[in-house]
Amino acid sequence: NRLDDYQWKNRLILVQAASENGGEIETLRSARAEIDDRDIVWFVNTGSDVVSNQKAVSGSLESDIKAVLDESRSYGRVLLIGKDGGIKSRESSLDLDAIFRRIDGMPMRIREMRAD
């Protein structure tokens, strides 16, 4: 599968980790309920591997993730991609509270919350 396969289904958080044990993976895993509630799929590029809350990351998907993170490297290490496929924010560090606030202010998310 490819990054495009998530469009209109999931919001994506892509993280270029500072190191293999930089804490980003644990931060994301500890917020599982909030992440699942917002239809978020996350990927952390540790340099040697891509870790995700998905079962498996194919070679083509890993290539897509690394390419997008490489293109945005000068703008930030953390990308939020909306369900429409557009980049919604680029940050220098992973701040889940800020990401959740940004998502919760998006029109599509507001409609989802009303429907629940």
Region roles according to the model:
Residues N1-D116:
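Non-catalytic interaction/Regulatory regions outside core domains
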